Regions:
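HotDog/MaoC-like acyl-thioester-processing domains
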Residues: 2-20, 76-82, 93-153
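Catalytic strand-loop segment that frames the active site of acyl-thioester-processing enzymes
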Residues: 2-57
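A broad, structural micro-motif
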Residues: 35, 67-69, 115
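Residue-level recognition of specific faces of alpha-helices
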Residues: 40-43, 68, 121
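Helix-adjacent hinge/juxtasegments
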Residues: 63-95
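Short beta-edge strand/loop motif at the mouth of beta-sheet-based domains
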Residues: 54-55, 60-66
């Protein structure tokens, strides 16, 4: 089944190779008229899902395993406002035995200004046992092929 991909390959901000576009909606803003700090996490989730879609890597959940968030850090560089078009870059920076660390960067498209950077570590967990499990080789192989020499293991 083919699904519409909402991201794209990009070489505009190495080492990132993939990005997804999103627009700031009014509901994303706070009383100061800028993007509420917590709204950036869904933007990065969106880009990560599209990254996986591009690599034909649906979730691992078919096997009763899921990636769960272990750590998330966000740094705010400049405010985004209602109706700004943002390009959210994402990459896998590191893959461990059972964890994957993603890096992200959000740029305003109009002037290519850096808005936010993020690092998120997810752990593959057996949902029944509630314990971490090794990341499958097929998953690692796809990431290695896409990220090439930019992936830490």
């Amino acid at each position: 089944m083919t699904t519409l991909e909402l991201g794209r390959l990009s070489d505009r901000h190495p080492p990132f190779k993939y990005s997804a576009l999103t627009r700031v909606w009014f509901s994303d803003t706070d009383a100061q008229g800028v993007v509420y700090y917590g709204r950036y996490l869904p933007y990065f989730d969106h880009a990560r899902v599209e990254y996986h879609r591009h690599l034909d890597m649906p979730t691992v959940s078919r096997s009763g395993r899921e990636f769960v968030m272990r750590a998330s850090t966000v740094e705010y560089h400049a405010p985004a406002r209602f109706d700004d078009l943002l390009e959210i870059f994402v990459r896998v920076a590191r893959i461990g035995r059972s964890s994957v660390t993603y890096e992200g960067a959000a740029y305003r498209v109009e002037d290519d200004a850096l808005m936010v950077t993020a690092s998120q570590t997810l752990v593959l967990v057996d949902m029944e046992e509630r314990a971490s499990v090794p990341i499958p080789d097929w998953w690692r192989d796809k990431l290695r092929a896409f990220e090439r020499g930019d992936l830490e293991e």
